[in-house]
Amino acid sequence: MVMNTDSLALIKNSIKTIPDYPKEGILFRDVTSLLEDPQAYKLTIGLLVEHYKEQGFTKVVGTEARGFLFGAPLALELGIGFVPVRKPGKLPRETISESYELEYGHDVLEIHVDAITKEDKVLVVDDLLATGGTIEATVKLIRNLGGQVNHAAFVISLPDLGGEKRLETMDLELLSLCEFEGE
């Protein structure tokens, strides 16, 4: 499976844009429409598998909640474990947490303390890169547990929101299958 312009265009075209959601002036990129299209969904996972299959990852970490939809099938296809990063109080075993800043306020993410070890080479997966706060916090969680993380994959990137710039200092190789301009 080759990451060519036709494949990437099919993925991008399967993502619906919803104007003025969740508030006026926002163009919401709805990745759930991609999930409704089995050809686009399968192609998305297939392209990620092809890109990462020879890189020696031992775990895929997906962020709540749509990162699960791409991270879990990717991990399954790569034959490695999947680790969820969730909002507080959603994981049953002992966790560590990391807070991060949002446009208005802050949020917190958690991971099980025994989910990542210093032997793990981790790929982080989410549906969307916007401001980069979620991925920054996720990478900090993984590194705090001793995991090696230098790659993050996204279906969508919104470069105008500054996520790539925010993550420049984190020594991450970023892959986005498609970009959309604007907010």
Curated annotation (Swiss-Prot):
Pathway per the UniProt entry: Purine metabolism; AMP biosynthesis via salvage pathway; AMP from adenine: step 1/1
Record-linked Gene3D superfamilies: 3.40.50.2020
Catalytic activity annotation: AMP + diphosphate = 5-phospho-alpha-D-ribose 1-diphosphate + adenine
Alphabetical keyword list: Cytoplasm, Glycosyltransferase, Purine salvage, Transferase
Compartments, record wording: Cytoplasm
An MF annotation (GO) of this entry: AMP binding
One annotated Gene Ontology cellular component of this protein: cytoplasm
Enzyme Commission number(s): 2.4.2.7
Pfam families xrefs: Pribosyltran (PF00156)
GO BP annotations listed: adenine salvage; AMP salvage; purine ribonucleoside salvage
Enzyme class, first EC level, given as a word: transferase
InterPro entries: Ade_phspho_trans, PRibTrfase_dom, PRTase-like, UPRTase/APRTase
Similarity remark: Belongs to the purine/pyrimidine phosphoribosyltransferase family.
Function according to Swiss-Prot or TrEMBL: Catalyzes a salvage reaction resulting in the formation of AMP, that is energically less costly than de novo synthesis.
Subunit structure comment from the entry: Homodimer.
Protein name per Swiss-Prot or TrEMBL: Adenine phosphoribosyltransferase
Species for this entry: Shewanella piezotolerans (strain WP3 / JCM 13877)
